[in-house]
Amino acid sequence: MKKNVWIASIVLVLALILNSCSTQQKTTAPVVAPVTQDTVVAVEPLKEVISIADALDMYQNPDKVDAITKKYGYKLKTNYEVYRLDKFNKMYYKNCVLAKLLTADKYEDYPKPMRKGVSSYVAFKDGAIIIAVFNQPAYDNLVAQVKAAGFTLDMPGSEDIYTKGNRTIACYKDGKSVRIQ
């Protein structure tokens, strides 16, 4: 009896194997995803926040930093250090309150927005310029300026990387900041 069960199971397995070998496999053509282009629209820079064009000019010509930031009404704080997090050579801020001072030269946090006006800061760190705003329309305006300046999206992600030649601009949506390198 056991012999018949073994023979029946072997015949069944062979039948399944032979049946599956004779089935034709269907091939599928690879699907080519269409490339989406970012829409570039002409945008008017906000008067309260430094424009991307002026920030690029400051990056190219560091001697123009004081004149450009004065034009927008930014105040200067040198050697701004967020305790155990960041250190900036220069921190220009507008409509912001500096965080609480923990030690002689270390602050508790980044600048905080005030209720009046569009709050922003421009920070200089390790050869990069960081522009941060505190509301979504101002951030969207900065990103639109980046696109209008001819930068193309190179790497999308949590921080969208735009490139133009050897210049790179990173737009961090969650932090509402733009970093020019």
Predicted regions and their residues:
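Bacterial N-terminal signal peptides that target proteins for export
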Residues: 1-10
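C-terminal motif of bacterial Sec signal peptides marking the signal peptidase cleavage site
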Residues: 17-20
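Bacterial signal peptide processing site
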Residues: 22-24
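Coil residues (strongly favoring Ser/Thr
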Residues: 38-39
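Second-shell loop/turn segments in exported
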Residues: 50-59, 127-135
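Amphipathic alpha-helical segments
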Residues: 57-78, 135-155
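Long, charged/polar, surface-exposed segments that mediate recognition or autoinhibition
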Residues: 92-159
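Short, exposed beta-strand-loop hairpins at the edges of beta-sheets
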Residues: 157-174, 179-180
